[in-house]
């Protein structure tokens, strides 16, 4: 889950974006009441989350963006966002000879600056991309330190792609031991799993452990190849799990002149599915405000409109679902970062 840069540069009308921002500004000034974002239950956790949540990528994971990142995070909370997602891997420097837990990621660092004073206002989620017990515990300690908190509301296995990873996680001294230990010691409240690569692998993961939540890729192109909707989403709903959608703009690749040309369609599409919330990383406050405005005004799409959006993506599935590329047998030169939401 990355930014919507292509959306803004190429497709979103300045007037529409300005109108959304102006409406939210009036609300902030107290001169006009805006509807609150709808809430949904986060599965069996008992928590209610707003239908739009803030992702910890895009600007928030980049070095040198402290002021912009803190502005986005604070504005999100001001607008009613009560779920923030991040990961130990987000914004982590790539330094040879260093272990994961020796490298502090920018996303958790920036979010932690805000959490120092606003922790009680949000449900805070992070992730471990280490598949071992000891490595994951070190990453959890790092997350708590950077996020300036004594516990996470949700700790997740990050981007499960292959059965070999599941075997390591559930094997001797695997990461699942860290998740259980952390929950027993009240360092985390709930446990989750995430992925956007191969839905069959995630289904097998759900069969091996009673996770509380799942973060999965969902957008109008999903149904065309290796669908998450009919497999992972269906199983997660059956298990009464909290479901968080990601990859809605697909790093901007879902937007094409001949296809989908704005964020409202795909965001409304995913919110019309049986999900608890969605996460999107934002480049700036204006993007955040536009997403919140769409969420506030959300009404479920009729089946015909859902089908129309799916049809628009049918000619560029390998772009709109690029994150499935290896599992789907596609390749794109230069796409070397699978460890993102």
Stretches found by the model and what they are:
Residues 101, 105-125, 176-181:
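Alpha-helix-loop-beta-strand connector modules within alpha/beta enzyme cores
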Residues 131-220, 224-227, 237-244:
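Glycine/proline-rich, positively charged
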Residues 42, 54, 84, 111, ...:
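Conserved, mostly hydrophobic/aromatic
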Residues 82, 230-341:
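Structured C-terminal cap/extension of enzyme domains
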Residues 45-60, 156-159:
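N-terminal small/glycine-rich loop or linker at the start of catalytic domains
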Residues 26-52:
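C-terminal segment of N-terminal export signals and the immediately downstream linker at the start
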Residues 85-113, 162-163:
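Glycine-rich, proline-tolerant flexible connector loops at the mouths of alpha/beta enzymes
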Residues 1-19:
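N-terminal secretory signal peptides and thylakoid transit peptides that target proteins
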């Amino acid at each position: 889950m990355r930014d919507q840069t292509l959306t803004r540069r190429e497709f979103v009308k300045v007037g529409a974006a300005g109108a959304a921002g102006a409406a939210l500004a009036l609300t902030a000034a107290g001169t006009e009441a805006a509807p609150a974002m709808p809430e949904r239950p986060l599965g069996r956790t008992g928590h209610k989350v707003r239908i739009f949540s803030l992702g910890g990528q895009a600007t928030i994971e980049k070095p040198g963006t402290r002021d912009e990142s803190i502005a986005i995070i604070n504005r999100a909370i001001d607008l009613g966002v009560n779920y923030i997602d991040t990961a130990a891997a987000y914004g982590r420097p790539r330094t040879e000879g260093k272990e994961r837990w020796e490298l502090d990621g920018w996303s958790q660092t920036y979010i932690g600056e805000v959490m120092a004073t606003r922790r009680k206002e949000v449900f805070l989620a992070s992730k471990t991309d280490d598949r071992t017990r000891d490595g994951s515990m070190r990453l959890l300690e790092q997350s708590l330190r950077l996020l300036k908190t004594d516990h996470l509301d949700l700790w997740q296995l990050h981007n499960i792609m292959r059965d070999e990873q599941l075997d390591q996680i559930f094997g001797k001294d695997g990461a699942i031991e860290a998740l259980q230990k952390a929950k027993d010691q009240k360092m985390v409240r709930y446990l989750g799993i995430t992925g956007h690569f191969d839905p069959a692998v995630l289904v097998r993961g759900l069969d091996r452990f009673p996770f509380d939540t799942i973060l999965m890729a969902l957008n109008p192109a999903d149904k065309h190849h290796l669908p998450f909707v009919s497999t992972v989403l269906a199983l997660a709903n059956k298990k009464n799990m909290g479901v968080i959608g990601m990859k809605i703009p697909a790093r901007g690749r879902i937007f094409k002149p001949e296809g989908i040309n704005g964020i409202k369609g795909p965001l409304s599409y995913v919110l019309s599915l049986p999900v608890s919330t969605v996460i999107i990383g934002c480049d700036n406050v204006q993007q955040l405000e536009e997403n919140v405005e769409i969420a506030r005004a959300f009404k479920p799409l009729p089946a015909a409109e859902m089908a129309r959006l799916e049809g628009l993506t049918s000619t560029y599935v390998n772009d709109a679902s690029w994150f499935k590329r290896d599992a789907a047998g596609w390749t794109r030169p230069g796409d070397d970062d699978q460890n993102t939401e």
